[in-house]
């Protein structure tokens, strides 16, 4: 796959500028290359491609290393002790203790790649399996089955220990985690309440990948009355609710108004989750209702409520327009510029929709219409919020990234920067500095410098949490606040989380000292270091002491990178399913767009990518089989 991407990049470099679409150029137009030769050359695209090629080559070599590690792991037939905490606390084992919290995209990528021969690896999560979250919408209507998009965490790395439990507290200073063993609900398989034992787990390095939860945005009634689509249990609940609505609407003695209300499904949020659920649900209604409930066809309707002016704001404008047209052609009622005021019950939602004057969207005259929708189900896909443990950590850690427009001023009477302090007792030059994504320190009042993001752990370019003892706590995925080289905040997507997890695993496998200090140096003894309130250091990149000491073999293994490269996110594009065999596919490599497709071609790309990105051959086969089964026999609407 890496070679294919490199080939695509080289082919893309041949024209001066790529064509967006063959339909854009009139038939009689002169050749594109001749038209562009008169324009001045812009060096920035070439520089972007050079950086992208460098990243692609690096990722390709990384993949080769990972393959050798996997082959060695397959050949290893050793069996670890059944009591993983006993082995974890074994003082005679010289390997560092690596604690991984979570079982999402970041944690799964990390566990799959990390070398468990170098670390005592322990994964803790209330969920014992990984979920391919982009296909949760498909599983909620029976297009694919739940088990086809899940993989046990233990299967990702047999040498890594796993505990199904909840981390109730995490102290980054003492490096201690309070773990309650058992799933998040505290229930056994028979549904009985069970108070799981709590243990104190000490670690040397912790990777925090706990993700996020669905956000209600403090709107009354959302938590009590809405369905979500964040976990597998959410997809199961949606599937049961939709199937139950069809059965109830087909019962005798109901009025047309009652049937129409029961079969009106409201989806809040016009991002990828909301749009894909609308597409899958419209497919389900066409398939199931026309096949098994023909009299209910006139009553079924999907309503999409979105606060913005366009759905799927992450995509190109032309693709956003195509998405809106496709949804409406599928009989999805799209309500733009509409915000939810409250949710009174599972059958009643109150909105306010923006209405512009005669001048359209640019008109200064704006009014709000209050609307009430009667429905049978409300699915909430309007954003996410931090997990409870993340909020606790954010409050506990020192805030090392105050807002850029309110920096602390240094004490002008002090002759030594190390002696100047602000009201909190911290050195003001610490607040006046900030890491950029390329590992450089710049002034905090510079344009585009990252600042703290509410509800997320701020990390440096090597994904170390700022405010914790350096190199002991890292954060990846949705729970982290990480910035790209241009100073923009990386999105909370599976693509970002998976790349971060793989990056941290390779950082650990290569033996970098995450503290970045000279060998044997104490944190406070490093010259010029920036310290937080706890004396924790945030200055130097991870370094290989063996390579610094002149170990040629280690230097070659690191490809000359004595100091670790900062994390670089490689954006490969966006995908979204719209229903009816149509999808959006925005394919890119870094900042360089390769193609943008909608309709059946986009659908083919969407399915191809999702099959390739499955985490195991088992899930890859099951997803293909489910698609074939649905095509031949339709979706299963059993209420279970």
What are these regions (language model features)?
Residues 44-50, 54, 58-67, 71-72, ...:
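Beta1-alpha1 glycine-rich phosphate/pyrophosphate-binding loop at the start
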Residues 46-74, 83-90, 95, 160-264, ...:
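FAD-binding core/adjacent interface of flavoenzyme oxidoreductases
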Residues 43-85, 95, 505-640:
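C-terminal, flexible cofactor-proximal segment of oxidoreductases
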Residues 31-99, 103-110, 116-119, 147-150, ...:
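N-terminal plastid-targeting presequences
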Residues 159-171, 328-343:
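A conserved beta-strand/loop element that lines the FAD pocket in flavoprotein oxidoreductases
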Residues 224-254, 373-506, 527, 532, ...:
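FAD-site-proximal beta/loop scaffold in flavoenzymes
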Residues 1-25:
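N-terminal chloroplast transit peptides
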Residues 259-335, 491-510, 514-523, 528-529, ...:
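Rossmann-like dinucleotide-binding core of oxidoreductases
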């Amino acid at each position: 796959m890496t070679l294919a991407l490199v080939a695509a990049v080289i082919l893309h470099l041949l024209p001066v500028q790529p064509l967006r679409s063959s339909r854009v150029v009139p038939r009689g137009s002169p050749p594109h290359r001749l038209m562009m030769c008169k324009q001045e050359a812009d060096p920035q695209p070439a520089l972007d491609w050079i950086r992208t090629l460098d990243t692609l080559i690096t990722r390709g070599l990384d993949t080769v290393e990972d393959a050798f590690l996997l082959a060695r792991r397959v050949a290893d037939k050793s069996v670890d002790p059944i009591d993983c905490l006993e082995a974890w606390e074994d003082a005679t084992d010289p390997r560092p203790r690596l604690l991984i919290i979570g079982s999402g995209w970041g944690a799964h990528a990390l566990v799959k790649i990390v070398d468990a021969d170098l670390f005592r690896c322990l994964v803790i999560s209330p969920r014992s399996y990984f979920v391919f979250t982009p296909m949760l919408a498909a599983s909620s209507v029976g297009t694919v089955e739940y088990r086809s998009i899940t993989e046990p965490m233990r299967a990702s790395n047999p040498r890594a220990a796993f505990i199904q439990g909840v981390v109730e507290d995490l102290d980054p200073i003492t490096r201690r985690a309070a773990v309650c063993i058992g799933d998040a609900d505290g229930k056994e398989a028979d549904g009985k309440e069970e108070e799981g034992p709590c243990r104190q787990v000490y670690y040397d390095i912790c990777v925090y990948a706990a993700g996020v939860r669905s956000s209600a945005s403090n709107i009354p009634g959302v938590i009590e009355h809405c369905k979500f689509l964040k976990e597998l249990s959410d997809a199961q609940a949606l599937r049961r609710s939709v199937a139950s609505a069809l059965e109830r609407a087909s019962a005798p003695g109901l009025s047309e108004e009652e049937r129409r209300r029961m079969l009106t499904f409201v989806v809040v949020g016009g991002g990828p989750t909301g749009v894909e659920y609308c597409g899958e649900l419209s497919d389900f209604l066409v398939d199931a209702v026309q096949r098994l409930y023909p009299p209910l066809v006139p009553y079924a309707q999907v309503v999409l409520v979105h606060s913005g002016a366009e759905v799927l704001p992450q995509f190109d404008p032309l693709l956003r327009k195509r998405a809106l047209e496709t949804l409406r052609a599928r009989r999805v009622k799209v309500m733009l510029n509409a915000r939810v005021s409250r949710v009174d019950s599972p059958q009643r939602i109150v909105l306010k929709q923006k209405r512009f004057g005669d001048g359209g969207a640019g008109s200064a005259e704006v009014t709000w219409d209050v609307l009430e929708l009667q429905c049978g189900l409300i699915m909430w896909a309007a954003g996410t919020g931090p997990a409870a443990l993340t909020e606790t950590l954010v409050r506990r850690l020192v805030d090392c990234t105050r807002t850029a427009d309110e920096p602390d001023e240094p004490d002008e009477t002090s002759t030594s920067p190390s002696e100047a302090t602000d009201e909190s007792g911290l050195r003001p030059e610490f607040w006046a500095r900030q890491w950029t994504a390329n590992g450089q320190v710049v002034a905090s009042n510079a344009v585009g410098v990252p600042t703290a993001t509410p509800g997320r752990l701020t990390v440096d370019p090597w994904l170390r949490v700022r405010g914790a003892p350096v190199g002991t706590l890292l954060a990846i995925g949705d729970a982290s606040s990480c910035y790209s080289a241009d100073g923009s905040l990386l999105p909370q997507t599976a693509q970002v989380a998976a790349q971060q997890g793989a990056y941290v695993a390779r950082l650990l496998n290569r033996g970098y000292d995450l503290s970045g200090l000279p060998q044997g140096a104490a944190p406070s003894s490093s010259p010029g270091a920036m310290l937080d309130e706890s004396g924790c250091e945030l200055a130097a990149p991870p370094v290989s002491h063996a390579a610094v000491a002149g170990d040629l073999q280690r230097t070659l293994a690191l490809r000359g990178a004595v100091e670790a490269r900062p994390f670089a996110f490689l954006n490969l594009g966006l995908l979204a399913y719209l229903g009816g065999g149509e999808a959006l596919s925005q394919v890119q490599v870094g900042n360089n767009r390769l193609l943008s497709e909608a309709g059946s071609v986009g659908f083919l790309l969407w399915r191809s990518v999702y099959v390739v990105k499955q985490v195991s051959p088992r899930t890859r086969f099951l997803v293909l089989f489910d698609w074939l089964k649905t095509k031949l026999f339709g979706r299963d609407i059993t209420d279970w």
